[in-house]
Amino acid sequence: MGLDMRFALVICLAIAGLSSATLVPAPALAEVVCSGHKLLSSPRPESSCSSLKPRIYPSPDGALRALVLPVDVSLYATPDMESRVVIRTSNGDTVTSKDYLSPRGTNGYYVVNAKWSPDSQFFLYSMASSGGHSPWSFPMMVYSREKKRIAPFSDMIDGKPTLSADFHFDGAHRLVAETWKAPGSLDDKVPVTVDLEDAFGKLPASD
């Protein structure tokens, strides 16, 4: 075989090798799942999901913004499996924040639903367990603009749990959620209506 023929053969083999390396099998081309509060069967790359953005909730009057950020603890879950809530002014100053992460990413909480009250005085959000614990329970938290404080909604309804992540406002700051009719009766839900301004005023002072 002549020199030119051998050189041509080497070039052909090199091109074939490059083609086989470029044609990655379809499963490897699948995008890494980065949202949706999902557990993963295998760990995602540590550098994955770096472009995931927070959920931003501007208050109706535009003075405040509530951010729900993914804390990205476990690679065996989407980064939004646990959350951090930050309240900021429209100028970017941080008013307060609250973390719901756990050391290994399986005993914290993620935010399900969130909404400002129509009068912009309260920000309420419901959560679910990152590890699937007590799947019937959806703890709710309330931020008070006047108090600059985040408090559990259950403290405003005699320690009762909230049994649904859904809620709505009936008035400027009157909240309607769901709890149980009697302790332990998970299938017997009843609505509970709370005036958040009155309820916050009755809470003990924070440390």
Language-model segments: what does each one mean?
Residues G2-C12, S20:
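Bacterial N-terminal signal peptides that target proteins for export
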Residues L29-Y57, V71-S74, Y143-D207:
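Acidic, small-residue rich beta-repeat scaffolds with periodic aromatic anchors
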Residues Y76-V85, G131-M141, G184-D195:
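Structural motif
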